[in-house]
Amino acid sequence: METIDLKGNAQRGLEAFTVAYDAELAKQYFKEDYIQHNPGAPQGLAYSLQMIPMMKEAGTTTETHRIFQDGDIVVMHNSILNAAPFGGDSFVVFDVYRMEDGMVAEHWDALTPMVEPSFGNSQIDGATEVTDLDQTERNKALAQRAVTDLFVNGKVETASQYISEEQYIQHNPMFPDGFDAFVSAMETMKTQMPDFKYVKAHHVWGEGNFVLVAGEGNNNGTAMIIYDLFRFDDGKIVEHWDIIQPIPAEKANDNGVF
């Protein structure tokens, strides 16, 4: 039985919109009734197809910086340029696709404007190679525990159990590299942003050294989507990318963002 290239199909599906600008090609990779969790997009493929002429006119393009697979889930770390149809100049986005029969059947995402780095690392650069496939389940479990201990429960004293003290590369543009900087940032947030809460991790998707945790937060009454991408090495987090996105009160579909 021929194995379907799910990562390839997910990427080709995205590029049908942002490289080929081809609705008929997109229909080959997206189910007509695919489940949409983006709060700004209605359910199904029809709305997305309507965006193609606007993307073509704007010259909207995407680039995939990281891609990995967890069963029928494909995770992509993308950038969007010339992104006027999406309400800005450029964005960084995590796109998560659930594949069925080789086609996209469900989609989650989180996006944030691309900004200039404050401490040297951009929101998209860094390691890309998926390695340590035999460590997938271990790393997923570690990521789940790290988010629970550090972000949900605020146990900064447990940081050394999860974060490498030798190398920690930070891609959040607000914070510098390093274990000490991570601990300092956590302490600062606890004192200066007491109304920011990480409520719950809803999904943990991973392959090898990469794990994406999709979680829910709340900032002074505003619900938030929080996606954290971790790269592990020898059981410790050595690199981190993230996106925090407010959840609008009015949503274009009834599927929920998680």
Model-derived features: where do they sit?
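C-terminal and inter-domain tail/linker signature
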Residues: 1-258
